[in-house]
């Protein structure tokens, strides 16, 4: 009986955790479409100019650091500084994770 209760509890916790992850992914995808897609493409793979970087497959910690630097002004680009400024730390983290999970630049071993 105790094993059944533990199994049911774990199933409930994992189910809610997966739902939260799916919600975070959906929110990040929507934010990426609203804020990033016009220049970087919807999946971060088709930048509109050669000077615009591909975001797909970049490391999430790099993307997060870059966005935080644009937000603080430590990294300068008029467009990116303005776009990063209103983003919350959570949105930045979610965007970084979203683009890092898209197929792209990084070779996975």
PLM ranges: what are they?
Residues 1-8:
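Bacterial N-terminal signal peptides that target proteins for export
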Residues 8-10, 20:
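Cleavable N-terminal signal peptides
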Residues 12, 75, 84-109:
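C-terminal capping alpha-helices of c-type cytochrome domains
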Residues 14-17:
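N-terminal signal peptide c-region/cleavage motif recognized by signal peptidases
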Residues 21-23, 42, 83, 98-100:
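Residue-level hotspots at or immediately adjacent to binding/recognition sites across diverse folds
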Residues 23-43, 56-58, 107:
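Sequence/structural segment immediately N-terminal to covalent heme-attachment motifs in c-type
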Residues 29, 45-72, 81-85:
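Gly/Gly-Pro-rich "capping" loops immediately C-terminal to redox-active cysteine motifs
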Residues 33-41, 54, 65-68, 93-97:
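C-type cytochrome heme c attachment motif
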């Amino acid at each position: 009986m105790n094993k059944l209760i533990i199994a049911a509890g774990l199933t409930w916790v994992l189910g809610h955790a997966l739902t939260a992850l799916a919600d975070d992914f959906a929110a990040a995808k929507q934010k990426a479409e609203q804020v990033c897609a016009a220049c970087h493409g919807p999946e971060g793979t088709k930048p509109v100019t050669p000077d615009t970087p591909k975001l797909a497959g970049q490391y999430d910690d790099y993307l997060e650091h870059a966005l935080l630097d644009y937000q603080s002004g430590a990294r300068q680009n008029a467009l990116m500084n303005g776009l990063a400024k209103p983003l919350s730390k959570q949105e930045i983290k979610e965007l970084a994770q979203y683009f890092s999970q898209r197929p792209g630049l990084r070779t996975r071993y």
